[in-house]
Amino acid sequence: MNDRMVWIDCEMTGLSLADDALIEVAALVTDSELNVLGEGVDIVIRPPDAALETMPEVVRQMHTASGLLDELAGGTTLADAEEQVLAYVREHVKEPGKAPLCGNSVGTDRGFLARDMRELEGYLHYRIVDVSSVKELARRWYPRAYFNSPAKNGNHRALADIRDSITELRYYREAVFVPQPGPDSERAKEIAARLSAPAAP
């Protein structure tokens, strides 16, 4: 089994789809074992001046500290960024609509992709693999694993944040998930039957 997974992270001037702009997009493709395929892409996008003027101060400070703000003047267009990301994704994912979007809290990223990079967003499966969901469950069910998870080093730069997300999922797979190959078929059927049985009156 070698199902592809498309990891995308975006940096924006804020979280509002009505007012804010994409300023960086990065992508890595992995196989089902979380091995990275190729070099990936990381592209800085020059936003409209209006989006820069209305950027919240906390976001401005974050992008200043990461160095991203200084790179925006030399950034490319949305169309060019989408073309570069799609070229990389298509190199490793041959069929559209097959590979899920993966990352941390990727619902927000998907919203901006659907607004600004429709062809790229449409190339992905409608399902997502959100590492933050795994993390939230681990916090509730396996707190020791949650509190000892790897430190993040991405510093709010898109490609580094993706690498952090992949590392996180590798960690939770080893620390929390049932070891491969998992339960045999009989045990799996037994669990399913027990959990789906009607509750006693």
Swiss-Prot record:
Task: Give yes or no: UniProt keyword Transmembrane helix.
Answer: no
> Recorded GO terms, molecular function?
3'-5'-RNA exonuclease activity; nucleic acid binding
Which Gene3D superfamilies did the record assign?
Answer: Ribonuclease H-like superfamily/Ribonuclease H
Q: What is its EC number?
A: 3.1.15.-
* SMART domains in alphabetical order: EXOIII
Q: Which InterPro entries match?
A: Exonuclease_RNaseT/DNA_pol3 (IPR013520), Oligoribonuclease (IPR022894), RNaseH-like_sf (IPR012337), RNaseH_sf (IPR036397)
Which UniProt key words apply to this protein? Cytoplasm, Exonuclease, Hydrolase, Nuclease
Active-site residue numbers: Y126
Does this UniProt record's set of keywords contain Nuclease? yes
Which part of the chain is the Exonuclease domain? 5-169
Q: What class of enzyme is it?
A: hydrolase
* Intracellular or extracellular location(s): Cytoplasm
Listed GO CC annotations: cytoplasm
Family per record: Belongs to the oligoribonuclease family.
Its annotated function is as follows: 3'-to-5' exoribonuclease specific for small oligoribonucleotides.
The name of this protein is: Oligoribonuclease
